[in-house]
UniProtKB/Swiss-Prot annotation:
Name of the protein in question: Outer membrane protein P2
BP GO terms, sorted: monoatomic ion transport
Bilayer topology: Multi-pass membrane protein
Entries under SUPFAM superfamilies matching the protein: Porins
One Gene Ontology cellular component annotation held by this UniProt entry: cell outer membrane
Other known facts: The sequence of strain T1 is shown here.
Localization in the cell: Cell outer membrane
Length: 371
């Protein structure tokens, strides 16, 4: 019988965690090192009303390094520290995206196997893993538009029931103002002020089901309102997924969806002759059917389609259709190669403006080596 798709995902896509090197293990304390080097060769083409831009690249694709320390107290209690780094690039100087090293995640955890765990620091939230669509690089879903994903958070996760994950997160301010005298240390304009989210996901007995709700508040731009930093006030959103594993076939079919409402605040212009910009709301939703299929041992095929629509009280409407398809193959338990392509078409209608159409095509061949 073929492996279940859940087992494939654990084995193929989380290899870095499963095969991390244990450098210390004594008296209930364990330290692990792991990560991956990942490179992609790609060709992409962007077209907006016949204005074409095309380029090819050989670049970093999410290479990372992590260290994890776990200390068991007994009776199921434990503490854990986790640090993960990534590369960032100044695109004008380093087109290969291998440049400065930055911290992606850094958090501490206190937990109990029966009662759940509390996580504090820069970490993923329940919204990160709600949707089921698979991708390596050109994912057409953007969960952060609906519910803010990873960030500075205090989170609780419960995994005491087989296949069920319950989570809740409180988001803290993400950025501080350092440029304005007298305002240093305050939350930066148009950055996250605070937020809250709750969610649940079930993946057992061939059923996948998940839902998450989040509300994120943003700092108003009250220091220099004539600067065009945006007027975002609050984003309230829902993400959900529903899927089924056909275990004998090695096939998962799923449907991801989301809805969000963004509130923009009224803003008085600095010049008295300029009219006040009124408040308005923007609504968006998407639906995305997808699949993941074990073509043969160590080879998987995956894909999904997305339809997304956005409309605002100001009269602007956007419709996007996107499709992604990919194939991956494990050359070794710690070596993964893949080819992936995506195509997206976006139509935008503004009040009193002509419709514009944008297209984006991308295809890439990648190699990941885990350690």
């Amino acid at each position: 019988m073929k492996k279940t798709l859940a087992a494939l995902i654990v084995g193929a896509f989380a290899a870095s965690a499963a095969n991390a090197a244990v450098v210390y293990n004594n008296e209930g304390s364990k330290v692990e090192l792991g990560g991956r080097l990942s490179v992609i060769a790609e060709q992409s083409n962007n077209t907006v009303d016949d204005q074409k831009q095309q380029h090819g690249a050989l670049r970093n694709q999410g290479s990372r390094f992590h260290i994890k320390a776990t200390h068991n107290f007994g009776d199921g209690f434990y503490a854990q520290g986790y640090l993960e780094t990534r590369f960032i690039s100044h695109y004008q100087d380093n087109a290969d995206h291998f440049d400065d090293i930055t911290t992606k995640y850094a958090y501490v955890t206190l937990g109990n196997k029966a009662f759940g765990e509390v996580k504090l620091g820069r970490a993923k939230t329940i919204a990160d893993d709600i949707t089921s669509a698979e991708d390596k690089e050109y994912g057409v879903l953007n969960n952060s538009k609906y519910i803010r994903t990873n960030g500075n958070t205090v989170g609780y996760t419960f995994k005491g029931i087989d296949g069920l994950v319950l989570g809740a997160n409180y988001l803290l301010a993400q950025a501080r103002d350092t440029a304005n005298p007298g305002k240093k240390g305050e939350v930066a304009a148009q950055s996250i002020s605070n937020g809250v989210q709750v969610g649940a996901k079930y993946d057992a007995n061939n059923i996948v089901a998940g839902i998450a709700y989040g509300r994120t508040n943003y700092r108003k731009n009250i220091i220099a309102p004539k600067q065009n930093l945006g007027r975002k006030d609050q984003v309230e959103g829902v993400l959900s997924t529903l899927g089924y594993h056909f275990s004998d076939l090695g096939l998962l079919v799923s449907l991801d969806s989301g809805y969000a409402k963004t509130k923009y605040y009224e803003q008085q212009q600095q010049q008295r002759s300029s009219p006040t910009k009124p408040r308005y709301d923007e609504k968006r939703y998407f639906v995305s059917p997808g699949f993941q299929y074990e073509l043969m041992e160590d080879t998987n095929v995956y894909g999904n389609f997305k339809y997304e629509r956005t409309s605002s009280d100001e009269g602007k409407k956007t419709r996007e259709q996107a499709v992604l398809f990919g194939v991956d193959h494990k050359l070794h338990k710690q070596v993964l190669t893949y080819i992936e392509g995506a195509y997206a078409r976006t139509k935008t209608n503004g009040k009193g403006k002509a419709e514009t159409t944008g297209k984006e095509k991308s295809v890439g061949v990648g190699l990941r080596v885990y350690f």
